[in-house]
Regions:
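N-terminal Rossmann-like dinucleotide-binding module
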Residues: 1-40
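Short acidic low-complexity segments
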Residues: 43-54
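Hydrophobic residues in well-ordered beta-strands that form the structural core
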Residues: 46, 84, 109-111, 140, ...
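Beta-strand-loop-alpha-helix segment that lines the small-molecule cofactor/substrate pocket
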Residues: 57-58, 64-65, 69-116, 131
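C-terminal capping/lid region of NAD(P)-dependent oxidoreductase domains
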Residues: 107, 134-138, 368-388
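Predominantly a Rossmann-like dinucleotide-binding segment in NAD(P)-dependent oxidoreductases
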Residues: 108, 115-210, 215
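C-terminal glycine/acidic-rich active-site capping loop/insertion
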Residues: 114, 200-201, 207-208, 220-221, ...
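Glycine-rich, aromatic-lined ligand/substrate-binding cores of catalytic
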Residues: 178-199, 204-268
Length: 388
């Protein structure tokens, strides 16, 4: 559901997956549905309701980011397994309702969070789970996506582009939470009031009357550690846009900048330092690291779309995916493969409803703290998924 510039990246991945029998598309704008139907030679519907009436058992939601919750809820209520782009929803009540529907129906819900497959998150998780980090102390992650780097279509949608940054928190949150295996329990956050001379973050323009373009938070985790999460849309940076800049335990730590990944460990009176860049960076990036303009090109998002990194287990993907395009640090293929396997085998997906809520709700609550000038607020939790 949703025939736009983002969903086009995923339709072929569904079409080629060995567990998928057929694919159809839908959009509430009939012309878009017809265009995609003809482009991919599949059935198409000119409304979400008509799609839900069809003989299908799974729905993928690729509507605008602030609209996902109601679509997911309706699909679950109609007995469909559901995949949605991020975020899960923009209201805590919708997140809770999705979790309760999954509990009640036994259906599969997966949020398509790219960043749990990002090499920096996978590396921190690997070292933390091995015990080499010790107890988790502190981590930093951010999603820095300046609106000047958005597509023209998004820049021109003034009602939607001014969404509060913390309503799109899952990239930054998921990277550190997936690595620690913990969840956020309390948040204090502050925002930057936009002063640029354009109508994006202005009252009376966007749907939220939002004037905050950048937001910054500290969150307490259930394991006792603290994380700093930034969501910025007016920021002098481009790439990487989603990354862990620091991740520390009592015994070891990880640091990152541009294309350099450093792992340190306490050893007696000093530390050992290991440059793990060749293990964590995409293979195409490493192959070009001796170029004179290498850092400049990394800062402009080169080699960060479809090239796998050695740490990513790309050999487990279906052979049918070998010649297909990838995206977002080579995460797209993992996302669709994981959902299709979960729906086919009726098992918990990687980012199930409970985990999706833990990646989403802290951001929604953080914005409430922003509006209250940094007042600490407890973060509600939807609990753990059932043991399979």
């Amino acid at each position: 559901m949703g025939c736009g510039e983002f969903s086009i990246n995923f339709i072929r991945l569904f079409l080629k997956h060995p567990y998928v029998e057929s694919v159809c598309v839908a959009d509430n704008v009939p012309e878009k549905a017809k265009s995609f139907g003809e482009m991919f030679n599949v059935s198409y519907y000119d409304s979400f309701e008509k799609m839900l009436e069809a003989d299908i058992n799974a729905v993928a939601i690729f509507t605008p980011r602030h609209t996902h919750g109601p679509f997911v809820i309706k699909a679950l209520q109609c007995g469909k397994n559901v995949y949605s782009a991020v975020p899960m929803a923009s209201e805590v009540t919708h997140c809770r309702e999705i979790v309760e529907l999954v509990k009640k129906t036994g259906l599969i819900y997966m949020m398509g969070e790219t960043c749990i497959y990002y090499p920096c998150s996978m590396f921190c998780k690997e070292k933390y789970q091995s015990g080499e980090m010790g107890n988790f102390v502190y981590g930093e992650a951010q999603y820095h996506h300046d609106i000047s780097h958005f597509s023209e279509h998004h820049r021109n949608d003034l009602k939607a582009i001014g969404v509060p940054p913390f309503y799109y928190p899952t990239h930054s949150l998921s990277m550190v939470l997936a690595a620690t295996g913990s969840y956020a329990t309390k948040v204090t956050a502050m925002g930057y009031e936009d002063v640029e001379d354009d109508p994006v973050f202005k009252k009376g323009v966007n749907l939220w009357d939002n004037t905050i373009s950048n937001a910054f938070s500290l969150m307490r985790l259930a394991n006792g550690g603290v994380i700093r999460i930034n969501e910025c849309r007016r920021i002098g940076a481009k790439a990487p846009s989603s990354y862990i800049s620091a991740f520390y335990g009592t015994k070891g730590g990880y640091q990152f900048s541009n294309a350099q990944h450093i792992f340190t460990q306490n050893k007696g009176e000093g530390v050992t330092l290991e440059d793990v860049s060749d293990y964590v960076n995409p293979i195409a990036m490493t192959e070009n690291k001796d170029l004179p303009d290498f850092k400049q090109r990394v800062a402009n998002h080169e080699w960060q779309w479809d090239s796998f990194a050695p740490i990513q287990d790309y050999k487990r993907l279906p052979k049918e995916y070998e010649d297909l395009k990838n995206g977002h640090m080579a995460s797209h293929k993992f996302l669709i493969d994981d959902f299709c396997r979960a729906a086919y085998n009726h098992t918990l997906p990687t980012v199930n409803a409970w985990l999706a809520a833990r990646f989403t709700i802290p951001g929604i609550v953080a914005f409430e703290s922003v509006k209250k000038d940094g007042q600490p607020i407890d973060i509600p939790d939807c609990g753990e998924p059932p043991v399979e």
